């Protein structure tokens, strides 16, 4: 994206493919051709489009798309929004939003709920949803800049021809997940893009102050806005872009040590076995409970073992998980063999061997997805098969490091750096090699 634009208005998919929605309009909203509406509402779909009903259950609009334009100061509440979709923290909650509400019929049975809002107002919610508005000031500034950068780069990527998100092969299933595959809105409101939970999570003025202080600032490289990725905790070393996404190295998304001292990469199985059971002196290796309470939203604090973790399954449990996630019957599961790791120890290619067949899968998110009812915290793990007298595995034990894909900014590491006194510019330089901070509007 060129380094000179105006602040855009964006569309955020709050929920998609919903049979119906209920909520409340707090203040007046204008529906073109209909008039003002406020108070409780519900909506569903039929062959003619969206059916919008008011508090008295009167039909007030029936069209393929219904746009409710907010009067100044008005907000709207959506009930039972699912967050953390397919992750271990998945749940439903009511959320309140600023800006306009758009209801679009997907088909005769489902609708999409979309929020139209200015980018800067969107960011205040993202910062407060991804982390906590009580986090250190320099960290909130860092997150404002990278979230702004990611969003602008994502808008630009929508207009590009992308490589297929799957590498074909009969014995290999190598798949990754792009974040610009939404067709009727710019970004979604969940972890697939950036967490956006409206004004519900804005618990202090600090996030708004950080967004305002950094207004229009982005990370740039080579004259373009950076695709600034981020995640919760690297485990000690961040990852190269191509371990998680397409085989196109990005100069500012390269592996770095999450410390002032260089650490050797975790490329071999011997090094991985040592790494996942170690406790290196790195920024995201923190036991500062006060800081974690300041920076993590409530549901993220439920995850206590994010730096190093352990998961165990019986063989039959893991066989069923893999069968459910992949749709493939491997028979009796014999082995899981890492074939290729990135510098952080995250597995890029993993062979699954069963009595019926053997398949190589990747990349990191697909591996995490296949080996858990939700997702493993990361693909930086070792796996040991505990075998019975007949030589067949009875249990599989996973020892792992970190939380997330590992590419770009380590959120917990960056927050620790801010607590130690590092400035936003220093934190960004640490995680994004060679990138610069630029003001574009």
Tell where the protein language model's regions lie, with residue ranges.
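Conserved, single-site charged/polar hotspot
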Residues: 1-441
């Amino acid at each position: 994206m060129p380094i000179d634009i105006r602040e855009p208005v964006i569309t955020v998919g709050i929920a998609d493919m919903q049979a119906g929605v209920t909520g409340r309009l707090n203040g007046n909203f204008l529906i073109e051709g209909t008039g003002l509406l406020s108070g409780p509402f519900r909506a569903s779909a039929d062959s003619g489009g969206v059916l919008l009903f008011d508090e008295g259950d009167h039909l007030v609009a029936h069209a393929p798309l219904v746009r409710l334009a907010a009067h100044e100061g008005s907000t709207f509440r959506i009930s039972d929004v699912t967050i953390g979709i397919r992750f271990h923290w998945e749940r439903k909650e009511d959320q309140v939003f600023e800006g306009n509400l758009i209801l679009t019929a997907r088909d005769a049975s489902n609708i999409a709920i979309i929020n139209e809002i200015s980018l800067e107002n969107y960011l205040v919610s993202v910062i407060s949803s991804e982390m906590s508005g009580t986090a250190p000031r320099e960290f909130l500034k860092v997150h404002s800049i990278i979230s702004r950068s990611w969003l602008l780069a994502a808008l630009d990527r929508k207009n590009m021809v992308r490589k297929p998100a799957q590498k074909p092969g009969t014995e290999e299933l190598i798949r990754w997940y792009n974040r610009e595959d939404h067709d009727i809105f710019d970004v979604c409101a969940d972890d697939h893009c950036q967490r956006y939970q409206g004004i519900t999570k804005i618990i202090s003025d600090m996030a708004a102050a950080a967004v305002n202080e950094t207004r229009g600032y982005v990370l740039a490289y080579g004259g373009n806005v950076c695709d600034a990725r981020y995640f919760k905790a690297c485990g000690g070393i961040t990852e190269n872009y191509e371990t998680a996404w397409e085989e196109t190295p990005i100069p500012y998304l390269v592996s770095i040590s999450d410390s002032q001292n260089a650490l050797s990469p975790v490329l071999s199985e011997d090094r991985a076995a040592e790494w996942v059971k170690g406790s290196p002196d790195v920024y995201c290796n923190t036991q500062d409970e006060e800081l974690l309470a300041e920076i993590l939203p409530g549901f993220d604090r439920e995850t206590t073992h994010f730096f190093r973790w352990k998961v165990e399954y019986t063989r039959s449990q893991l066989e069923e998980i893999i069968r459910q996630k992949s749709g493939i019957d491997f028979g009796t599961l014999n082995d899981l063999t890492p074939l290729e790791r990135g510098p952080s120890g995250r597995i890029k290619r993993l062979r699954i061997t069963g009595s019926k067949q053997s398949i190589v899968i990747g990349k990191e998110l697909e591996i995490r997805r296949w080996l858990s009812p939700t997702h493993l915290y990361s693909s930086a793990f070792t796996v040991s098969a505990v075998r019975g007298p007949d030589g067949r595995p009875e249990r599989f034990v996973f020892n792992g490091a970190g939380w997330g894909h590992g590419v770009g900014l380590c959120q917990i590491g960056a927050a620790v750096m801010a607590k130690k006194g590092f400035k936003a510019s220093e934190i960004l330089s640490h995680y994004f090699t060679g990138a610069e901070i630029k003001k574009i509007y």
